[in-house]
Amino acid sequence: MQSKLLKGELDLLALHQAQPTRYPFLLESVAKSSQNHYSLLFAFPQQTLSLNHLTEPSFVQQFDQYWQQAGVDDRAQRHLPFRGGWFVYLGYELAGQLEPSLQLPSSSKALPIAVAVRIPAAIIVDHQAKTTTFIAEADFADYLPIMWADSQALPHLSLNSQALRLNLQEDSPELFLNGVQQIREYIAAGDVFQVNLSRAWQGELQSTHSAVDLYQRLRQANPAPFACLAQFPAFSIISSSPERLVRVEQNVIETRPIAGTRPRGQDAANDQALLQELISHPKERAEHIMLIDLERNDLGRVCEYGSVKADELMLIESYQPVHHTVSNERGPLKAGLTPGP
């Protein structure tokens, strides 16, 4: 791998806006902490693997073959969070291929179920060290001077100041309540022991705004540790979340589940009262402990037997709009694992 260091923090969103085809995917730490102080802009996308229907060949098996053929060397410069590889989007509907016995219905959305894009180069901002690192795999070293030149001619971020007008629709309350009743029947019958029931929201813009405009407004309204702007040819993904699902570093995997939330208070006293309520509420504690058990079981499938430990238990993380209860579980991966089954 080849790299080049620049002092200072490059505006990755501005570079993405200037050249979205060359730099299509941004992962950003907007609310920074010791857990997350990097932002990454992926560069020069190569081949793409997509899954559009569950009846197509296994996405995970195909991706595993691509991953092994690429042979990305991740031993050099281990301190960096990305050293070449893939940008991957996995929709919930992929469970239909991982667990075909569930016979899940197809999604009505005109989106791919999963996408993997080969990425040989990236720009990484370390918000703690206040540096920017340009990296490229050895076979793609010619991209380094191009990225450097782009950074030296970086235009200012241009945003639409027009008011955002949105027609928002959501599933009816009756549909949600019917789902609750059906779940209770499943639990009573012993068919399930955990369900995540959600409601669909759909909005239609009444004014012209780019994906960059929407992302900028989201990160201002909800600054979070893990934000994403990914622009594909036919659709974009915009997200902002406090939760990291999985991290793998030096053969150790960890997950950091969140369960338990309270809004921030109107003043310091009210904020502290809400925080104490979150800490002591029996329902919140029971739900969080259940989630820890589920995550331990999930990690146990890929970790060495009996090695999964909770090294942080029911801590409070506070963000601009809310308090969260957070734990951290980790363990060493089994030998010989690859992304595939």
Segments predicted by a language model, with ranges:
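Extended alpha-helical targeting/anchoring segments
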Residues: 1-341
